[in-house]
Curated annotation (Swiss-Prot):
pH dependence text: Optimum pH is 7-8.
Further facts: Present with 13700 molecules/cell in log phase SD medium.
Top EC class for this record: hydrolase
Protein family membership: Belongs to the metallo-beta-lactamase superfamily. Glyoxalase II family.
Cofactors named for this entry: Zn(2+)
Residues with Phosphoserine modification: S257
Residues reported in the UniProt entry to bind Zn(2+) 2: D63, H64, D144, H188
Species this protein is from: Saccharomyces cerevisiae (strain ATCC 204508 / S288c)
The protein's name: Hydroxyacylglutathione hydrolase, cytoplasmic isozyme
Highest taxon of source: Eukaryota
Length: 274
């Protein structure tokens, strides 16, 4: 399994990622969230372009799915005999041909991919959990549901739904035994800003060792995609630590009386105000 991260909209502030997921053994690939063709296509080799079997969206927002039609047209012109699918969570994803149900299994060459529906940021949000059975490598493409040390805004959902998405749907599908080997590839590079928010919850160095290490990494590296795992998220991401008394206190639950949805909603509101 190989993952190529492609920057999009960094100069305009969007700091999006497109990803080329490849099964190098079978020379097949998926192009995930290629919203900006002029930025994506020059980053692909001719062999990579020919290898694309599907354009894949994590959700329908323009900065993830608006490149579908142009990319599809380009790839068909490049290889007229090939069939390129468009995979997404709803008909709102342009040119979509496959809308997978929750936990639908798909294959890319030898790679096994589970489609985890995570409605909240949008109703059609999907995270794609990938396993390479040959090497046992694993990763997950989380779009705007899970960011490194953060999560997406609840545009079309609630705190309860985001809690379910992060802490049930993703974690339980992947399985605790696989958290430490499942690398996270989010839709945006928001990590540095997220660290500033999380530091308000754990203000002292030493309170959260995982956060300290993430902060140090961010001080030296611009790109964090694929560098951290689900286990890391459970250790430093407050949206995945709702049972932590420090997270509860930061949200305003001083007597441990709030339910998880209330804590999640308040955390998101606090992050929105930053």
């Amino acid at each position: 399994m190989q993952v190529k991260s492609i920057k999009m909209r960094w100069e305009s502030g969007g700091v999006n990622y497109c990803y080329l997921l490849s099964d190098s053994k079978n020379k097949k690939s998926w192009l995930i969230d290629p919203a900006e063709p002029p930025e994506v296509l020059p980053e692909l080799t001719e062999d990579e372009k020919i290898s694309v079997e599907a354009i894949v969206n994590t959700h329908h927002h323009y900065d993830h799915a608006d490149g579908n039609a142009d990319i599809l047209k380009y790839l068909k012109e490049k290889n007229p005999t090939s069939k390129v699918e468009v995979i997404g969570g709803s008909k709102d994803c342009p040119k979509v041909t496959i809308i997978p149900e929750n936990l639908k299994k798909l294959h890319l060459g030898d790679l096994e991919i589970t489609c985890i529906r995570t409605p909240c940021h949008t109703r059609d949000s999907i995270c794609y959990y990938v396993k390479d059975p040959t090497t046992d490598e694993r990763c997950i493409f989380t779009g705007d549901t899970l960011f490194t040390a953060g999560c997406g805004r609840f545009f079309e959902g609630t705190g309860e739904e985001m809690d379910i998405a992060l802490n049930n749907s993703i974690l339980e599908t992947v399985g605790r035994q696989n958290w430490s080997k499942t690398r996270v590839y989010p839709g945006h590079e928001y990590t540095s800003d997220n660290v500033k928010f999380v530091r308000k919850i754990y203000p002292q160095v030493g309170e959260n060792k995982a956060l300290d290490e993430l902060e140090q990494f961010c001080s030296k590296h611009e790109v964090t995609a694929g560098r951290f795992t689900l286990k890391d998220e459970v250790e430093f991401n407050p949206f995945m630590r709702l049972e932590d008394p420090k997270v509860q206190k930061a949200a305003g639950d001083t007597n441990n009386s709030w339910d998880r949805a209330q804590i999640m909603d308040k955390l998101r509101a606090m992050k929105n105000r930053m």
